[in-house]
Swiss-Prot record:
Descriptive protein name: Phosphoserine phosphatase
Disulfide bonds: none
Top-rank taxon, per record: Eukaryota
Classification via Gene3D superfamilies: HAD superfamily/HAD-like, Phosphoserine phosphatase, domain 2
Organism: Drosophila melanogaster
Residues annotated as binding substrate: E76, R112, S156, G157, K205
Keywords: Amino-acid biosynthesis, Hydrolase, Magnesium, Metal-binding, Phosphoprotein, Serine biosynthesis
Pathway per the UniProt entry: Amino-acid biosynthesis; L-serine biosynthesis; L-serine from 3-phospho-D-glycerate: step 3/3
Alphabetized NCBIfam families for the sequence: HAD-SF-IB (TIGR01488), serB (TIGR00338)
GO-annotated biological processes: behavioral response to ethanol; L-serine biosynthetic process; L-serine metabolic process
Family label: Belongs to the HAD-like hydrolase superfamily. SerB family.
Function: Catalyzes the last step in the biosynthesis of serine from carbohydrates. The reaction mechanism proceeds via the formation of a phosphoryl-enzyme intermediates.
Length: 270
């Protein structure tokens, strides 16, 4: 890889003596895609890990990839859609089982969507009535990245129809969005989802980044930012992972991440 880059050390252990507590925060940071401010869970005392070095990683990266749910936006899109369709508690039970390793990501996605079975009109109404809330300072950070000439991508296990308004709000072209696709029949009833999308299965974010690398220079420095384990596991082919805990702190991700921030402002070197 050309140029001087920071060494990619193994993820450091969590700082001793810090318990990962949670509290409710106002997540209406520097703009939303509409709607009222919402609250979300974040850590009360979780300190960032090496934020200055993380900012240097961003400075040296040519490509920056973001997770969407609980990272770029405050919410988890499929959970919000399930609640809107009156299936919140049923979907939450499946999500809990999936997090416990009882099923694959794709199986969990299939089961949850078969529970929700949103119509095309319900999805349109949901997007209109419950627009996603942008995380604090993310819009300013993305603008900063673009001003520096960096390419910005969104990589999500959520759905492109829910993410498109977010991408538009941030000025990210839809060709730079890797997400799942809902499929509807000719009456607008839910049919299935596209299993050919890389993010529809376990390891899909790494697959997406491999495709991004193939489209760009092989020696491009790629950084993935996200709150979850699937984001952490995108290295490799991503060069770096920066954990984000501005909305929710996942203890295992915090423990394993070498770099961790709780506000996108910490990555702007200010």
């Amino acid at each position: 890889m050309s140029g001087s880059v920071l060494s990619l050390a193994r993820p450091a252990a969590a700082t001793n003596g810090h318990n990962l507590l949670t509290k409710q925060l106002n997540c209406n940071g520097n703009g939303t895609t509409g709607g009222a401010a919402k609250t979300t869970v974040a850590s009360a005392i979780t300190p960032p890990k090496q934020p200055q070095l993380a900012a240097k990683v961003i400075q040296q990266s040519q490509i920056v990839c973001f997770d969407v749910d609980s990272t770029v936006i405050c919410e988890e899109g499929i959970d919000e859609l399930a609640e809107y369709c009156g299936k919140g508690s049923e979907v939450a039970r499946v999500t809990k089982e999936a997090m416990g390793g009882a099923m694959t990501f794709q199986d969990a996605l299939k089961i949850r969507l078969n529970i929700i079975r949103p119509t095309q009109q319900q999805v349109r109404d949901f997007i209109q009535e419950r627009p996603s809330t942008l995380s604090k300072n993310v819009k300013r950070f993305v603008s900063h990245l673009k001003a520096e000439g960096k390419q910005v991508y969104l990589i999500s296990g959520g759905f492109d129809c829910l993410i498109a308004p977010v991408a538009n709000e941030l000025g990210i072209p839809l060709k730079n969005v890797y997400a799942n696709k809902m499929l509807f029949d000719y009456l607008g009833e839910y049919d299935s989802f596209d299993i050919n999308q890389p993010t529809s299965r376990s390891g899909g974010k790494a697959e997406a980044i491999a495709l991004i690398r193939k489209e760009n220079s092989d020696d491009s420095l790629i950084t993935m930012i996200g709150d979850g384990a699937t984001d952490l596991e995108a290295v490799p082919p991503a060069n770096y992972f920066i954990g984000f805990g501005g909305n929710v702190v996942r203890p295992e991700v915090y423990r394993r991440a070498q770099y961790y921030v709780t506000d996108f402002e910490q990555l702007m070197g200010q």
